[in-house]
Amino acid sequence: MAKEIVKELLPLIRVYKDGSVERLLSSENVAASPEDPQTGVSSKDIVIADNPYVSARIFLPKSHHTNNKLPIFLYFHGGAFCVESAFSFFVHRYLNILASEANIIAISVDFRLLPHHPIPAAYEDGWTTLKWIASHANNTNTTNPEPWLLNHADFTKVYVGGETSGANIAHNLLLRAGNESLPGDLKILGGLLCCPFFWGSKPIGSEAVEGHEQSLAMKVWNFACPDAPGGIDNPWINPCVPGAPSLATLACSKLLVTITGKDEFRDRDILYHHTVEQSGWQGELQLFDAGDEEHAFQLFKPETHLAKAMIKRLASFLV
């Protein structure tokens, strides 16, 4: 007898009456590696916190054998808050490449996913991880210190970023850090938002007027945070809505927003960039158009000319 479906968000996820979940678009998980054969990057899995449980995969480039301290990049994967993981094939391959190209320590957070953990669970897991990083900067971590951070990290160069829904998480962490101090007063140097997932009730730019309320972006947010005050115009998903917290408080000294030609969030992300620019935010603001591609293409097709160019652009920012 077929299991009864109680909810589905196609083409992403299917939820059954018995509580089981089928994640339709997730790539397979792969193991961490002492040395990636293509890049020489080392990776391992670590526990950030026990209650609630948060884990991550940390990446260390081959150059760590020198005495130079390395920037830290706290990364949040995409997947509409409901598919993929810190350990999935595409994320693992991408961060091996980026860690090697940029010469950074990357930390990929395995935040809690829908449907059992609606937003803001992913935001909270991100904040927990930021505090965990900060605990290494001032040597207050006595429970689960990470030697790769203690021995190789430059805590004056902390970056926070991600793809699509992961970039949404990063944005919300940057806002929170602007209003709530991290342990030891750790500062975030940069934010890297690749095709961030933002949306709103009123179509803008090239967004289709007809069917806007039935768009996948709308359905994802209603699935992710069904009780959000304001619904799709909650500032978590629509940071440009009137009455949203000022983007002038973003807690980083420089911010890079990337867009692509075929991404449905393109106009939202250009508006976000403009809103930051007009907010009075005092940092260095950058916008990069990666070309005529879908969002997150550099994860799926890293060997292409445009992907290589984008990864080089990201690496030049993470310094």
Swiss-Prot record:
<dbReference type="GO" id="GO:0106435">
    <property type="term" value="F:carboxylesterase activity"/>
</dbReference>
<feature type="active site">
    <location>
        <position position="263"/>
    </location>
</feature>
<dbReference type="GO" id="GO:0009813">
    <property type="term" value="P:flavonoid biosynthetic process"/>
</dbReference>
<keyword id="KW-0378">Hydrolase</keyword>
<dbReference type="InterPro" id="IPR002168">
    <property type="entry name" value="Lipase_GDXG_HIS_AS"/>
</dbReference>
<feature type="short sequence motif" description="Involved in the stabilization of the negatively charged intermediate by the formation of the oxyanion hole">
    <location>
        <begin position="77"/>
        <end position="79"/>
    </location>
</feature>
<dbReference type="InterPro" id="IPR050466">
    <property type="entry name" value="Carboxylest/Gibb_receptor"/>
</dbReference>
<feature type="active site" description="Proton donor/acceptor">
    <location>
        <position position="295"/>
    </location>
</feature>
<dbReference type="Pfam" id="PF07859">
    <property type="entry name" value="Abhydrolase_3"/>
</dbReference>
<dbReference type="GO" id="GO:0046287">
    <property type="term" value="P:isoflavonoid metabolic process"/>
</dbReference>
<dbReference type="GO" id="GO:0033987">
    <property type="term" value="F:2-hydroxyisoflavanone dehydratase activity"/>
</dbReference>
<comment type="function">
    <text>Dehydratase that mediates the biosynthesis of isoflavonoids. Can use both 4'-hydroxylated and 4'-methoxylated 2-hydroxyisoflavanones as substrates. Also has a slight carboxylesterase activity toward p-nitrophenyl butyrate.</text>
</comment>
<dbReference type="InterPro" id="IPR029058">
    <property type="entry name" value="AB_hydrolase_fold"/>
</dbReference>
<comment type="similarity">
    <text>Belongs to the 'GDXG' lipolytic enzyme family.</text>
</comment>
<dbReference type="GO" id="GO:0052689">
    <property type="term" value="F:carboxylic ester hydrolase activity"/>
</dbReference>
<keyword id="KW-0456">Lyase</keyword>
<dbReference type="GO" id="GO:0009717">
    <property type="term" value="P:isoflavonoid biosynthetic process"/>
</dbReference>
<protein>
    <recommendedName>
        <fullName>2-hydroxyisoflavanone dehydratase</fullName>
        <ecNumber>3.1.1.1</ecNumber>
        <ecNumber>4.2.1.105</ecNumber>
    </recommendedName>
</protein>
<keyword id="KW-0284">Flavonoid biosynthesis</keyword>
<comment type="pathway">
    <text>Secondary metabolite biosynthesis; flavonoid biosynthesis.</text>
</comment>
<feature type="active site" description="Proton acceptor">
    <location>
        <position position="164"/>
    </location>
</feature>
<dbReference type="InterPro" id="IPR013094">
    <property type="entry name" value="AB_hydrolase_3"/>
</dbReference>
